[in-house]
């Protein structure tokens, strides 16, 4: 087990990670609101959770991880009423699409995916405890949390509530840091056909912030070691989670370490439907982009840094995967009988060094950029050793194993011996590429080129037309 340093948003600095039980690190991550397909900004946050999970396991920790499904909120109610469907009917296909997207980008399945609507009793229990402590008031049949009565409000977002007017409220789930007010815990129904529950705290449905506090309690019984989410959730969502959970259970630790992933930009701008730069994973795949390249790009920048998503960056990600895969394929050609059940026992000193440096990079607040530098340095050295025939079978097997070890985080490599394409298959792909170029579908054209290059096929434009040859 390797010691980890995480940047804790609560303290504003890197800290030694000290879970309650290293063999069962508890992690809660804010998941999708299932009213539409997740966009690629959401996907970056979900893949950050995947890298966190894979890193904890690689560094010797046991994990017990949860990502919630928000299946009741303002947007879901609005759209379900418009579609004349029940909440369950409306959210089911979007929930299914979320899991399909995770599979497409090779995200590992977590231990728990609770739905908000399955945790109503836990929400009611939290409200009742808050009522007993005088932290709740009623207005227009809805229940609100009085933030001025909670002493530690603002400790995560460092917000100052001293200038706030007493009793100013928000019914909406999302609002800006500059306009802090009391937030709603339990909403009375306002619209015809609005989903609601008859409970001991009244007829209504939960506010968004209450849902996560309740689901954490339902899954773990108390708090967690790590809570993650996008930086846009830090306020008000996570701040309000702290207020609810610590207000109801002041004797318990709610969250030890808060990790927040930064925004994703598209061509240097914030993603927006009005700007025409709003993409889902399915949009990108329809354009011919490789899911592996999408995954690689979304995990390749440190989670606390903004990531710019662009066509050039996707092409760069494809090239980087190809660089690693081509090295692996060279070794597999020499060692075709190697099995993919690796034990990761390394005896070569420089391979041991690569392993150690890779682990140390991840243990430093998931420094993926530094980890990737180790990967590419190892690929460079392995290629050099293969070029000069300076390795035997035993050594080559270790090279395969170290690349497999790296791929426990990357999740983009293929360890099966490469099957050569038939000439007819190559001709068919080249014809498809020509059609794509004619239609100005350059994303698909580039994807086919990358596919052929990965198979060692070079394409040449000549006066007589397109020719291809094997490298």
UniProtKB/Swiss-Prot annotation:
Pfam families: CysS_C, DALR_2, tRNA-synt_1e. GO terms for molecular function: ATP binding; cysteine-tRNA ligase activity; zinc ion binding. It comes from the Bacteria. The keyword Aminoacyl-tRNA synthetase applies. SUPFAM superfamilies: Anticodon-binding domain of a subclass of class I aminoacyl-tRNA synthetases, Nucleotidylyl transferase. It catalyses: tRNA(Cys) + L-cysteine + ATP = L-cysteinyl-tRNA(Cys) + AMP + diphosphate. Its main location: cytoplasm. Zn(2+) binds at residues 30, 212, 237, 241. GO terms for biological process: cysteinyl-tRNA aminoacylation. Keywords: Aminoacyl-tRNA synthetase, ATP-binding, Cytoplasm, Ligase, Metal-binding, Nucleotide-binding, Protein biosynthesis, Zinc. GO terms for cellular component: cytoplasm; cytosol. A motif ('KMSKS' region) lies at residues 270-274. Its EC number is 6.1.1.16. It is found in: Cytoplasm. It is an enzyme of class 6 (ligase). Its cofactor is Zn(2+). InterPro entries: Cys-tRNA-ligase (IPR015803), Cys-tRNA-synt_Ia_DALR (IPR015273), Cys-tRNA/MSH_ligase (IPR024909), CysS_C (IPR056411), Rossmann-like_a/b/a_fold (IPR014729), tRNA-synt_1_cat_dom (IPR032678), tRNAsynth_Ia_anticodon-bd (IPR009080). A motif ('HIGH' region) lies at residues 32-42. Monomer. NCBIfam families: cysS (TIGR00435). Belongs to the class-I aminoacyl-tRNA synthetase family. This is Cysteine--tRNA ligase. It comes from Leptospira interrogans serogroup Icterohaemorrhagiae serovar Lai (strain 56601). The lineage of its organism: Bacteria, Pseudomonadati, Spirochaetota, Spirochaetia, Leptospirales.
